[in-house]
Design a protein with these regions (language model features):
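Conserved Rossmann-like nucleotide-cofactor binding loop
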Residues: 46, 85, 231
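Mg2+-dependent phosphoryl-transfer enzymes with acidic/Ser/Thr/Gly-rich catalytic loops
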Residues: 11-20, 34, 60, 208-288
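Structural recognition of alpha->loop->beta junctions
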Residues: 96-112, 182, 262-277
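Active-site phosphate-binding/coordination module
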Residues: 58-154
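A structural signal for isolated positions on well-ordered beta-strands in alpha/beta enzyme cores
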Residues: 38, 76-78, 104, 224, ...
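Conserved acidic, metal-coordinating active-site core of Asp-based
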Residues: 147-238, 247
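Non-catalytic pre-domain segments flanking phosphatase-related domains
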Residues: 1-43, 47-52, 62-65, 69, ...
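Active-site flanking residues adjacent to catalytic metal/cofactor-binding acidic residues
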Residues: 41, 107, 227-228
Length: 288
């Protein structure tokens, strides 16, 4: 498991030391050649605190200033999220910010892309199974007797069922996994589990695929990835793959008590979005 950062908010504090040799090599490569480094970050739970209503999620108040200080010093910063790219841009407050010209948002696990330079979103046509599931899901949940407090989030190229507001969120989550997987399969979709949420989305794209393709496109010589949830595990696997190909990488976990799998695999664990912001700020200061 990675070590935790300290509680200090002083950006001149020394960087924490990753707990693994591979993580230390990844950090050393970032510091040695920042202009050839890609930094990838999840949004919810990493840059933005988890809230009961995802529509109310916003980036940590210091996230954009920290990114704006760091982004000009590296090859690129990529926010990789299951949200639509445009929603992540709005909730993150990324548009029109000086210093974020090197930022891209890869939404819907890379199916959509927003570039800060152009300010536009590019995307392929939607999977027809999403529209079919969207139409069927309310009645489907009624028929299987879904837990009270369960609710549906419309995500454009995906549909999510949340259990965080249920009387027993974890029990509701477990009870819905198999029925929703059956529904998704029937329409050519997959189920992506997260922190008290089950997302029905098209197969073939995940954060690992998105990160791998972007790092290779950028010709990066090192990669850092920061995440908090099960959907970030493919991105961790992508960093492992890049490491095996000779590209140093650093795995950072935005720690929480809800998901422990990432902390167990990370080189470095920080204390949620506040810890992520602190790390970004400290990196920016170290690269001055």
């Amino acid at each position: 498991m990675g070590i935790h950062t300290t509680d200090s908010t002083n950006p001149t504090d020394p960087l924490p030391t990753p707990a693994t040799r591979a993580g230390r090599e990844g950090l050393e490569a970032l510091l040695a050649r920042p202009g050839a480094a890609v930094i990838g970050l999840d949004f919810d739970g990493t840059l933005a605190p988890i809230v009961a209503d995802p529509e109310q999620a916003r980036a940590h108040p210091e996230a954009v200033p920290a990114l704006a200080a760091l982004a000009p010093k590296v090859a690129s910063v990529a926010v990789i999220t299951g949200r639509p790219a445009g929603v992540a841009v709005r909730h993150g407050g990324f548009a029109g910010v000086s210093g974020l010209e090197h930022l891209v948002v890869l939404g819907h696990y890379g199916a959509e892309r927003w570039d800060a330079v152009s300010g536009t979103v590019s995307a392929p046509p939607s999977h027809p199974g999403v529209a079919a599931v969207r139409a069927e899901l309310p009645g489907f949940l009624d028929r299987i007797g879904a837990w009270r407090g369960t609710w549906i989030e419309e995500k454009g190229r995906a549909v999510a069922v949340h259990t965080r507001r249920a009387e027993d969120p974890q029990a509701a989550f477990e009870a819905l996994r198999a029925p929703l997987a059956e529904l998704a399969t029937r329409h050519g979709l997959i189920v992506e589990p997260g922190r008290m949420v089950l997302e029905l989305r098209p197969p073939g794209m995940d954060k690992g695929v998105a990160l791998l393709e972007y790092v290779r496109e950028a010709g990066a010589e090192s990669v850092t990835y920061v995440g908090d949830d099960l959907g970030d595990l493919p991105a961790y696997a992508a960093v492992d793959k890049l490491r095996s190909d000779g590209v140093p990488g650093l795995l950072v976990c935005s720690g929480s008590s809800e998901v422990t799998e990432l902390a167990e695999r990370a080189d470095l664990v920080v204390d949620g979005p506040e810890g992520v912001v602190r790390l970004l700020r400290t990196l920016a200061a170290q690269l001055d």
